[in-house]
């Protein structure tokens, strides 16, 4: 595992842990987690929209996800415009389809697969708690 080899994760018994806080490796791991957080949050948004909608067109999934991401950005101070960029969401949905994490129905709409539900459960543990709470409060899109 490269993260362990680089000292960004440490094995302690059966657990993988962050390095000690006063180390350069901890700072590097923290920077990496910050860089990845927006990507993880975008996945959480798209997967939540899929969950709420049951089935949805690709265009509507991207549009709705962008609107939610833009709202999250303004609420939680994420100042990078690429957080809710149209092309980023388009690529994300394409990747989900290519990896068969979402299913294309006969009428061309998209829906959750068993794999995307498992991914969603994992992703929800990684996003900031306030983002997760906000997404859970969405009842319709």
Question: What do the PLM-derived regions correspond to, one by one?
Answer:
Residues 1-141:
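Membrane-interfacial terminal anchoring regions of lipid-handling membrane enzymes
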């Amino acid at each position: 595992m490269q993260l362990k080899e680089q000292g960004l994760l440490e094995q302690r018994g059966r657990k993988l842990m962050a390095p000690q806080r006063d180390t350069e490796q901890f700072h590097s791991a923290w920077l990496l987690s910050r860089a990845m957080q927006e990507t993880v949050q975008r996945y959480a948004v798209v997967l939540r929209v899929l969950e709420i909608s049951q089935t949805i067109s690709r265009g509507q999934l991207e549009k709705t996800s962008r609107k939610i991401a833009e709202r999250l950005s303004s609420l939680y101070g994420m100042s990078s415009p690429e957080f809710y960029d149209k092309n980023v969401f388009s690529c994300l949905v394409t990747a989900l389809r290519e990896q068969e994490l979402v299913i294309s129905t006969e009428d061309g709409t998209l829906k959750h697969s068993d794999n995307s539900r498992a991914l969603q459960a994992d992703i929800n543990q990684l996003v900031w708690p306030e983002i997760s709470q906000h997404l859970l409060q969405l009842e319709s899109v």
